[in-house]
Amino acid sequence: MNIKKFAKQATVLTFTTALLAGGATQAFAKETNQKPYKETYGISHITRHDMLQIPEQQKNEKYQVPEFDSSTIKNISSAKGLDVWDSWPLQNADGTVANYHGYHIVFALAGDPKNADDTSIYMFYQKVGETSIDSWKNAGRVFKDSDKFDANDSILKDQTQEWSGSATFTSDGKIRLFYTDFSGKHYGKQTLTTAQVNVSASDSSLNINGVEDYKSIFDGDGKTYQNVQQFIDEGNYSSGDNHTLRDPHYVEDKGHKYLVFEANTGTEDGYQGEESLFNKAYYGKSTSFFRQESQKLLQSDKKRTAELANGALGMIELNDDYTLKKVMKPLIASNTVTDEIERANVFKMNGKWYLFTDSRGSKMTIDGITSNDIYMLGYVSNSLTGPYKPLNKTGLVLKMDLDPNDVTFTYSHFAVPQAKGNNVVITSYMTNRGFYADKQSTFAPSFLLNIKGKKTSVVKDSILEQGQLTVNK
């Protein structure tokens, strides 16, 4: 038995009893000599107070994903027989869309609609200047089945699916892909992974000529970011926990290379567990709000989910050869709020750093947020490493609440910075996979989001073509 862990649980139990009896802080201090604590661990937090403001705030149309006309939505013609969902463009170091020999490139997850385990990365491309969804061509799968074995990597050989990531156009004209190696063989082990993708160009097409320098980068250290062994030790799926270490997003700053990614906090920066419910830093606002909200949470059916909620947008520094150089603190964490903040995305715009993430209401512990609610949250800082403050006072940037069965349901919203101006293009996928015989998961119509300092708003009447990446304004 872990005596330290047992002692910590006993302390928490005493405080829980005191709170339920209405004694709050004074009773707890008298019985155990300890008090509710406030520990930020030197990172920014998505607080319960901010999130509780969102159900009212989201009624404003400037935060709402536009309504789309289902009769105009097309499957991707070059992806016949495939659902296509999470996607990301080949980007320059500053986040703008790269021009690769006259083409824009998008990497996307795709698979057989009838087989939920069929998840691989495909490469799509479109001539610069074209915007129609029918102009997207399909170069096929990035990786051959044999590549993971040929890489001579002990983690890669157990990969069963390829999950989301990012891609950068390097200064020497190469395509460097980052993605998530998912292994169904090891309780959902997830590993940040990279490869150079060799692509040849002609006047009419792009062709994948294999990959090289294919290797694992990071699978969690346990201290800063939860690893799969901790998930297993605590009961794996039966525990109700949700282990994440995925969606690597590449970014450069001042000559340094980094990955920002979805994760869960580790044992040294605010781990999951009942004791986390008594950290004032996770609640925000004031001590009186903490007392009221913590008592309510302790008596609610969301208590167990909140205990396990320790989502984070993590960060590591890379060497020039894209190996791990340094494990860094998370940019932001969502302890007690949600265990899952996805599709990490960060870029510099007009002198500020903007950090975005997608999340589902069904994974949250906030009153007033429903299981159908879909969000893109956003944060702003003067530096890449933070501290980050919520955009629009709460972090709400986009909200969508369509039934998952709706053809125009969208998720995986991704902000693409433009070369000029204050608008970014929002891409996403439309239609959940495997729901319809004739409607596949496809590129959703893009639209514009305006960013000015600490505020954002959806630009009215700004719906673009399906999968459109850039605007000439």
Curated annotation (Swiss-Prot):
Q: Which Pfam families does this one have?
A: Glyco_hydro_68
Effect of substituting residue 360 to S: Drastic decrease in catalytic efficiency. Reduces affinity for sucrose. Synthesizes only oligosaccharides
In which residues is Ca(2+) bound?
Answer: 241, 272, 308, 310, 339
Per UniProt, sucrose binds at 85-86, 164, 246-247, 340, 360
Q: Where is this site: Transition state stabilizer?
A: 247
Effect after changing residue 182 to Y: 1.7-fold decrease in catalytic efficiency. Synthesizes a bimodal levan molecular weight distribution
Q: What is the effect of changing residue 342 to A?
A: Lack of levan synthesis
Activity regulation per the record?
A: Ca(2+) may play an important structural role and promote stability of levansucrase. The enzyme concentration is a factor defining the molecular weight (MW) levan distribution. A bimodal distribution is reported at the usual enzyme concentrations. At low concentrations, the enzyme synthesizes high MW levan, and at high concentrations, it synthesizes low MW levan.
Which compartments is it annotated to reside in? Answer: Secreted
Instruction: Spell out the catalytic residues.
Output: 86 (nucleophile), 342 (proton donor/acceptor)
Enzyme Commission numbers on file? 2.4.1.10
- Effect on the protein upon substituting residue 341 to V: Increases transfructosylation activity
Q: What is the effect of changing residue 164 to K?
A: Loss of activity
Impact upon substituting residue 182 to W: 2.1-fold decrease in catalytic efficiency. Synthesizes a bimodal levan molecular weight distribution
What is the recorded phenotype of mutating residue 182 to A?
3.7-fold decrease in catalytic efficiency. 1.6-fold increase in KM for sucrose. Synthesizes only high molecular weight levans
Alphabetized UniProt keyword annotations: Calcium, Carbohydrate metabolism, Glycosyltransferase, Metal-binding, Secreted, Signal, Transferase
What catalytic reaction does the record list?
Answer: [6)-beta-D-fructofuranosyl-(2->](n) alpha-D-glucopyranoside + sucrose = [6)-beta-D-fructofuranosyl-(2->](n+1) alpha-D-glucopyranoside + D-glucose
Q: How does it assemble?
A: Monomer.
Name assigned to this protein = Levansucrase
Species of origin reads Bacillus subtilis (strain 168)
Q: Could you read off the lineage of the organism from its UniProt record?
A: Bacteria, Bacillati, Bacillota, Bacilli, Bacillales
Give me the gene this protein comes from. sacB
